[in-house]
Amino acid sequence: MDSSSNVHPVTIRRDTIIRENNLPVIAELQDETQPNNSPQKSRKRNLFNTDIRTMAKDNPFFAEASKVIAGKLEVKDADNRRMILNYCEHLRTSYTTKDIDFLRQVFSDQALIVVGNVVRAAGKQGATGIEGDEKVTFSLKTKKEYLARLEMVFAANKKIDVKFTDFRIMRHPTMEGIYGVSMKQKYTSDRYSDEGYLFILWDFRDKSMPLIHVRTWQPAASVNDDKEIIGIRDFNLE
C-alpha cells in the first residue's frame, strides 16, 4: 500500500506569490543551454546521511544543526530538521553531479517553479548575474518543462558548482511536516554565474518520499533588506 495516499496534497494559491517588484525566480540563462561537446561522465546517485554532531562551524548548515543537537526541540520536529539537512545537502550536490533522477524524484508533480532569465545589455558581463540596467524576465514552468531545460543546462556545462550560506529552516505554524528553507546561493558554471536567495518549500509528511512544492530564487542585487527575502509566510497553503 502506498503510504503517500493518506497524505493530503498541498495546494498553493499561485496568485499570491508573484509580486510586482522583486519577483522570485530560478536563475537560468538562455545561452547556458547550448551544448558543450565535452564528454559527460555518468555518476551514481548516493544518498547519504550527514553526521551533524561532527559538523564544522564553517559548514553552512552548522547553526541549524546546533539547534537539533541542543535537544530543545520536539522529537518529531528535530527528526524532520535532521532529515531536511540531509536532503538539502543532497539537493545541492545533485546540481554539481547532474543527478537529474534525484531532482525528478523530489520535485512535486504540481511544483510551483518560477523561472527567470537574466538579460544583459550588449557588451556587459556581470560577475553575479545581474548588474546596473540588466533585466530579469520571468515565466512559470511545470516540473516537466523545468527538468527538461535543466538537462540541457547539465549537457551544456562540464562543471557546475553550488555553494550555500545563511541557511535557515522555518517550520510552518499550523501544517505539521511542512517546512520552508531559505539560503543564499552562489551558482557557478562554465557559461554563467550568479548569487541570490533561494527558497524551498519542503513537505516531509511522508518521510519515505519528501517533496519540494516550491522553489524560488531572487537575485542578491535586487534585495535591499531581509524583509524582501521570500519566505514561508509569502505562500497561502490550503
Model-found features: residue ranges?
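Signal peptide processing junction and immediate N-terminal pro/mature segment
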Residues: 1-9
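Short, solvent-exposed secondary-structure junction/capping segments
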Residues: 89-93, 105-132
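Surface-exposed, charged secondary-structure patches
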Residues: 127-193
